[in-house]
Amino acid sequence: MSVLTKCSLVAVVAATAVATSASAALVAGWTITTAFPTGAGNVPTGVTYTVGAANEGLQTTGSELRSVHSLAAATYTSPAGNGSQYAFSSNNWSTGDFYEARLSTLGYSDISISWDQTRSSTGPATFELVMSTDGGANFTTLLASYTVLQSGGGGAPGTWSSTTYNPIYSLNQAAAAADNQANVIFRFRSLATTAAAGSSRIDNVMIYSGPVPAPGAIALLGVAGLAGLRRRR
């Protein structure tokens, strides 16, 4: 295959990826833009903590991202996110504890969700994703079990950083049953009980209408540009 043909193929694939990204509408998204309180006596504790409404998207009114624990000793902090300034972290995990995103999808179809999640070395490694379309009265399972990778430490694929995005920590899931619903809940529920200090961290929780933008779409476009530059030379 000629260099020209290879460059042309890369450019076509990149253009397709960007076009797919552009066709997706962000209904609601949380990137955790505000630090949680710190210092002696100020760190949030208790059975629940919320970061409030989505800071991005077309349907943020009435939305909420929160964490719920069975132990009042749970603490909530905002360490570095996955390529963003902060993340939503908590410890003292018991089986059944969860993060959850609430929103309305009225007027939107082809719903899907993507999120970044990691843990400490002693944090819960297995979660499930369940969904409710009636405000929490009933739940259905979207992902029966998924593995959460450790951030940093021996054998870990990388450490979360506020300046570098690592797509290996990203997950996504289609949720067609959430189309055009007034009271949708996506719940990330722990399937394990861990040591008190074991933490789980979530970031970049995004609910889309339409295809989920590929994490590598922009990088691929950059590759296409570089290929074009080489061709002109």
Model-based region annotation:
Residues 130-133:
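Conserved Ser/Thr-centered positions that define the repeating blades of beta-propeller domains
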Residues 213-230:
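A short, hydrophobic C-terminal helix/tail in secreted or cell-surface proteins
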Residues 105-114, 124, 181:
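Extended extracellular/luminal ectodomain segments enriched in beta-structured repeat modules
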Residues 1-9, 215:
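Bacterial N-terminal signal peptides that target proteins for export
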Residues 23-62:
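Extracellular carbohydrate-recognition regions
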Residues 29-36, 122, 139-211:
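Terminal, low-complexity interaction segments
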Residues 10-17:
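Bacterial N-terminal signal peptides
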Residues 54-106:
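Surface-exposed, low-complexity/disordered Ser/Thr/Gly/Pro/Asn-rich loops and linkers
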